[in-house]
Amino acid sequence: MAADPQSSVLLAFALLCLPWPQEVGAFPAMPLSSLFANAVLRAQHLHQLAADTYKEFERAYIPEGQRYSIQNAQAAFCFSETIPAPTGKDEAQQRSDVELLRFSLLLIQSWLGPVQFLSRVFTNSLVFGTSDRVYEKLKDLEEGIQALMRELEDGSPRAGQILKPTYDKFDTSLRSDDALLKNYGLLSCFKKDLHKAETYLRVMKCRRFVESSCAF
C-alpha cells in the first residue's frame, strides 16, 4: 500500500525537528539510520534553499544574456574545487563513509563565516525571508555530521586534516557590478558545495540502508 503523502510530510518535518545526540552513548541513543535520515533531510533542505536563493538573485540582478558566460567564468573560483573531494555520485561511491563525512564537514564549515552576511543581501527577499537562519541550519548539519563521525570512527585516530577552504564574505552594498558578480559567484559555489554534501550523505545512507530512494 502506498504511503499517505501527508504522513510522509509530517514524518519528514518531525525528523527535521529532532535534536542531535550530544554524546555517543547518550540515552536514549539515536539509531544510526535516524542519524543518517536527519542529516540527509537537512542537507536536502539547505541545498534547495541555496538553489532557490541563487535563482532569485539571478532573476533580480543578472541580465539573461550574460548568465551563460558568467556561469562559465565562475566554474574555477570555488575553493572546494581545490580539495580532493569526489565530484559526483560515482566518485563518491569509491570513498569510505568516514572520508565522505570529513569532506561533507569541510564543505559545511567553509560557509559558516560567509553566510552570516547573506541575510543582509536578501533583506527584501521572499525566498530568503522565510529561511533567514541559514547559519543555524548549517551549524545544525555540522553537528549531525560530527555525530555520525563519532559513531563511525569509534574513537580511532583521525587522518591528517585537509586545509580548510575559506570564502570571502558576501558584499552587502550591491552598488557595483563587481559586488553583484562577487555575490553571484559565491551563491553559485554555495549551491554546488551543498549539492556535494547532500550527494555524499545520500550515498552513505543508501549503501548502508538499501531503500527505494537510492536512485538519484
From Swiss-Prot:
It is found in: Secreted. PROSITE patterns: SOMATOTROPIN_1, SOMATOTROPIN_2. Transmembrane segments: none annotated. The modification Phosphoserine is found at S131. Keywords: Disulfide bond, Hormone, Metal-binding, Phosphoprotein, Secreted, Signal, Zinc. GO terms for molecular function: growth factor activity; growth hormone receptor binding; hormone activity; metal ion binding. Belongs to the somatotropin/prolactin family. This is Somatotropin. The lineage of its organism: Eukaryota, Metazoa, Chordata, Craniata, Vertebrata. The gene is GH1.
